[in-house]
From Swiss-Prot:
Domain GOLD: start-end pairs: 275-383
GO BP term, example: regulation of cholesterol biosynthetic process
Species the sequence originates in: Homo sapiens
Keywords of this entry: Activator, Cytoplasm, Lipid-binding, Nucleus, Transcription, Transcription regulation, Transport
Disulfide feature: none
InterPro entries: CRAL-TRIO_dom (IPR001251), CRAL-TRIO_dom_sf (IPR036865), CRAL/TRIO_N_dom (IPR011074), CRAL/TRIO_N_dom_sf (IPR036273), GOLD_dom (IPR009038), GOLD_dom_sf (IPR036598), SEC14/CRAL-TRIO_domain (IPR051064)
Subcellular location: Cytoplasm; Nucleus
Domain CRAL-TRIO: 76-249
Pfam families, alphabetized: CRAL_TRIO, CRAL_TRIO_N
Gene encoding the protein: SEC14L2
One cellular-component annotation, GO: nucleoplasm
Function noted in UniProt: Carrier protein. Binds to some hydrophobic molecules and promotes their transfer between the different cellular sites. Binds with high affinity to alpha-tocopherol. Also binds with a weaker affinity to other tocopherols and to tocotrienols. May have a transcriptional activatory activity via its association with alpha-tocopherol. Probably recognizes and binds some squalene structure, suggesting that it may regulate cholesterol biosynthesis by increasing the transfer of squalene to a metabolic active pool in the cell.
Protein name (Swiss-Prot/TrEMBL): SEC14-like protein 2
Length: 403
């Protein structure tokens, strides 16, 4: 049995009745605690009454703390309204709202430099509530329960800039919030136009997703427009995505409904860095350098680094070793990222590199040009691995061609 209204086993019916009894003290604090609502929490915890109750009570506290009942009337800051990409547009064949997430033009670093993380998370909460409100409108309009949403995840233009650690961490916080407070609301998620980098990006966010959510993610290949139209009527899909819907002025992207983001002008910036915690600290003597080595076992892995120096600039470059088991000078190795000096004492430096070859990569902090000052450098380096399942899926689909 699916655990949904009208499809409950005797054990599930008994669990529902007991669950309602156990949480009756908090039901008045919830917008519409009908059987559909309660079953979402039970399904999310496999009908474990104790875990379901703990999850729901935590959600009630979340609603109080974040003032969720009034969040739709809250207006996000101007920079978020103008540049946070995505939007609700159309309905699938079952009448469920469709949400578009547009990744490529999203300026994640600009958003975190221009708005507080709390305002960004609050905006995502507001979007969740707007989608649930739309589900309620559809329920009234169609005369049958609508309680889930379809998401189209447009990954065209997904690049290394989107792997910036503070942005991934902020997105992870949102995913945790979604999993904990909006269980069983995702019907399916279509990933379209996924580039070769997608398996690495997906592997970064996968830990924040429940197993059930992961099963609802469908990575589509070159025929993605045809697949979408099997689930959504053409008149409910923008021309940009293979349908016939346009804005009243004929715009094929339906920009009145979907925000396509873009680079954020620096006039919006309220900070030029995001506070970081670094894993390592090293003192580099004058006229010296410091090397850290990372083994890359197969192509497609991504090196991600962040560093800051105290008091003065420092050189940085990446090299590939030509001899194993011994320290090599920069001139003896293959240069991968040219060495240059960075003002990381003023603004922390960060970057990513897709490793096209396996081998030992050396990240070299250079202070050889300084004859007077030693440098203290704080840094974090990570090797980001691709998700093998999605990588294989993309190979099968031939979906790894877009750059």
């Amino acid at each position: 049995m699916s655990g949904r209204v009208g499809d409950l086993s005797p054990r599930q019916k008994e669990a529902l009745a007991k669950f309602r009894e156990n949480v009756q003290d908090v039901l008045p604090a919830l917008p519409n605690p009908d059987d559909y609502f309660l079953l979402r929490w039970l399904r999310a915890r496999s009908f474990d009454l104790q875990k379901s109750e703990a999850m729901l009570r935590k959600h009630v506290e979340f609603r109080k703390q974040k003032d969720i009942d009034n969040i739709i009337s809250w207006q996000p800051p101007e920079v978020i309204q103008q540049y946070l990409s995505g939007g609700m547009c159309g309905y699938d064949l079952d009448g469920c709202p469709v949400w578009y997430d547009i990744i490529g033009p999203l300026d994640a670093k600009g958003l975190l430099f221009s708005a507080s993380k709390q305002d960004l998370l609050r905006t995502k909460m507001r979007e969740c509530e707007l989608l649930l409100q739309e589900c309620a409108h559809q329920t009234t309009k169609l005369g049958r329960k609508v309680e889930t949403i379809t998401i189209i995840y447009d990954c065209e233009g997904l690049g290394l800039k989107h792997l910036w650690k503070p942005a991934v961490e902020a997105y992870g916080e949102f995913l945790c919030m979604f999993e904990e407070n909006y269980p069983e609301t995702l019907k399916r998620l279509f990933v379209v136009k996924a580039p070769k980098l997608f398996p690495v990006a997906y592997n970064l966010i996968k830990p924040f997703l429940s197993e059930d959510t992961r099963k609802k993610i469908m990575v589509l290949g070159a025929n993605w427009k045809e697949v979408l139209l099997k689930h959504i009527s053409p008149d409910q899909v923008p021309v940009e995505y293979g349908g016939t819907m346009t804005d009243p002025d004929g715009n094929p992207k339906c920009k009145s409904k979907i925000n396509y983001g873009g680079d954020i002008p620096r006039k919006y910036y309220v900070r030029d860095q995001v506070k970081q915690q670094y894993e390592h600290s090293v003192q580099i003597s004058r006229g010296s350098s410091h090397q850290v080595e990372y083994e890359i076992l197969f192509p497609g892995c991504v090196l991600r680094w962040q560093f800051m120096s105290d008091g003065a600039d420092v050189g940085f470059g990446i090299f590939l070793k030509t001899k194993m088991g011994e320290r090599q000078r920069a001139g003896e190795m293959t240069e991968v990222l040219p060495n240059q000096r960075y003002n990381s004492h003023l603004v922390p430096e960060d970057g990513t590199l897709t490793c096209s070859d396996p081998g030992i990569y050396v990240l070299r902090f250079d202070n050889t040009y300084s004859f007077i000052h030693a440098k203290k450098v704080n840094f974090t380096v990570e090797v980001l691995l691709p998700d093998k399942a999605s990588e294989e899926k993309m190979k099968q689909l031939g979906a790894g061609t877009p750059k």
